[in-house]
UniProtKB/Swiss-Prot annotation:
It comes from Danio rerio (Zebrafish). Its main location: cytoplasm. PANTHER family: CHARGED MULTIVESICULAR BODY PROTEIN. InterPro entries: Snf7_fam (IPR005024). It is a peripheral membrane protein. GO terms for biological process: endosome transport via multivesicular body sorting pathway; late endosome to vacuole transport; protein transport. It is found in: Cytoplasm, Cytosol; Endosome; Late endosome membrane. This is Charged multivesicular body protein 1b.
């Protein structure tokens, strides 16, 4: 295993560890919410407020861990592409030297700084790999198109039977959402017309 492959393994491991930390925070948030409810039932508002603050803090920490996990995972995917294409530059190799200790620390600020260095390296690597990625139809990018994210979130909300009131930027209306909405609107208009005819 080359040193770059070892670093790649450590990146993937760190992404999983960050995800685990996120789930741990989720559990702690739920436990704090239960404590809030119990404190309110006992009429102890001061204790309820403390547990509510803890719940919010755990929720925010969970989101931060999850966001960083996704970021590390995206960088790992880019390193994988670079390793596969044998395009690991000297400057990129320099960035990874202190990486292992940073990832093991689970310090979000340090990991964020490390990811920024990687992302800068990938900006230059992108120019070199664009042609190769096009031919491979690679979908590995550091950012995900927001329209696709919004559409997926709407689909998941529909499956769960929830109403997801999301403000989509103009010009990015999801075709799935609009066709369903217009069909529902047509049906509602027809029912309203029938009711008017009856009255």
């Amino acid at each position: 295993m080359s040193s770059m492959e070892k670093h790649l393994f450590n990146l993937k491991f760190a992404a999983k560890e960050l995800q685990r930390n996120s789930k741990k925070c989720d559990k702690e948030e739920k436990a704090e919410k239960v404590k809030v409810k119990k404190a309110i039932q006992k009429g102890n508002m001061e204790v309820a407020r403390i547990h509510a603050e803890n719940a919010i803090r755990q929720k925010n920490q969970s989101v931060n861990f999850l966001r960083m996990s996704a970021r590390v995972d995206a960088v790992a995917a880019r390193v994988q592409t670079a390793v596969t294409m044998n395009q690991v530059t000297k400057s990129m190799a320099g960035v990874v030297k202190g990486m292992d200790a940073t990832l093991k620390s689970m310090n979000l600020e340090k990991i964020s700084g490390l990811m920024e260095k990687f992302e800068r390296q990938f900006e230059t690597l992108d120019v070199q790999t664009a042609q190769m990625e096009d031919s491979m139809s690679s979908t590995t990018t550091l950012t995900t198109p927001q329209g696709q994210v919004d559409t997926l979130m709407m689909e998941m909300a529909d499956e769960a039977g929830l109403d997801l009131n999301m403000e989509l930027p103009q010009g990015q209306t999801g075709s799935v959402g609009t066709s369903v909405a217009s069909a529902e609107q047509d049906e509602l208009s027809q029912r309203l017309a029938k009711l008017r005819d009856q009255v």
